[in-house]
Amino acid sequence: MVVIRLARGGSKNRPFFNIVATDSRNRRDGRFIERVGFYNPLATEGEEGLRIAQDRLSYWQGVGAQLSPTVARLVKQGAKKAAA
């Protein structure tokens, strides 16, 4: 099953997450099908903290991909931020 979830990057104490479409059997930071966006929890005021390619997210959901709970929360947060 294809899932859309976070893959951790960055360095120690400086997390950075890629939002990826991957097979659920792959490791968290392992092989992925496509990078859909990113999330930087430590972004400062001048930096972009969240970017999601909505067209690709819609495509993957259309072919049956499931969102992880955290990615679902981030998508909701991004939609709220875009509307404001």
From Swiss-Prot:
Gene Ontology biological process terms from the UniProt entry: translation
GO MF term (any one): structural constituent of ribosome
Cellular compartments per GO CC: cytoplasm; small ribosomal subunit
Protein's UniProt name: Small ribosomal subunit protein bS16
InterPro entries: Ribosomal_bS16, Ribosomal_bS16_dom_sf
Keywords for this protein: Ribonucleoprotein, Ribosomal protein
One Pfam family here: Ribosomal_S16
Organism: Ralstonia nicotianae (strain ATCC BAA-1114 / GMI1000) (Ralstonia solanacearum)
Membrane-traversing stretches: none
Family named by the database record: Belongs to the bacterial ribosomal protein bS16 family.
Lineage summary: Bacteria, Pseudomonadati, Pseudomonadota, Betaproteobacteria, Burkholderiales
Superkingdom classification of source: Bacteria
HAMAP family, A to Z: Ribosomal_bS16 (MF_00385)
Record gene name: rpsP
